[in-house]
Amino acid sequence: PHLICIVPLILEKIYRKQIKPSLEKGVVKLAMRVPLLDTQVYASVCNRLTESFGGEFTQVIAGGAPLNSEVEEFLHKIKFRFTVGYGLTECAPLISYTYYKDFIPTSCGRVLDGLMEAKIDSPDPQRIPGEICVRGEHVMKGYYKNPEATRQVIDEEGWLHTGDIGTMNEDNTLFIKGRSKSMILSANGQNIYPEEIESKLNNMSCV
């Protein structure tokens, strides 16, 4: 295949069930501590992972859910050809994407130039997370025979309120933190996103 679109869970399962256990074996674990040998180990792992997806592809695009931070960091370390996209059914479906060579870790790509506009409902979109709002040719006109549901997500200016919370840098690259409905406001005013806690728990070997 030229292009592979998958959910993050597939990459995470391959990493936890196959890759991580193999790197914790005696000889391999020792080699990982030796300069130059570690790069050879990473190259070998990358080649095996690439072959497991058929070998002849340009890139793997993960989407549909957050990618575990440990898995993402490792895939970048071994130089695996992957990127992360972001979309909604209401946007038919892609909102942001970046070619793997230009992909920024922890992001979900750049808003599609010329097709989609995006803004963060925040006083400081680059630093303070807020709701991600989008509009453009690909955004739906409304839910079928459900004007009330449509009014709840699309405002008078045509912005679709996604319900996702995140930030956006100067070149319109999106960084998703979590869902507005799941966000917890602590007693000291700090926003807590369960998705970030879940990601850390998933990195534990006992989980």
Which ranges hold each PLM region?
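Alpha-helix/helix-capping structural signal
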Residues: 9, 65-66, 138
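Extended, hydrophobic alpha-helical segments in both membrane/secreted and soluble proteins
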Residues: 82, 90-93, 161-180, 194-197, ...
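Glycine-rich phosphate/pyrophosphate-binding beta-alpha loops
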Residues: 64, 140, 194
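Gly/Ser/Thr-rich phosphate-binding loop
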Residues: 2-5, 14-103, 117
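Conserved ATP-binding/catalytic segment of the ANL
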Residues: 111, 119-186
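Short acidic amphipathic segments
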Residues: 201-207
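ATP-dependent adenylate-forming carboxylate-activation enzymes
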Residues: 1, 5-6, 192-198
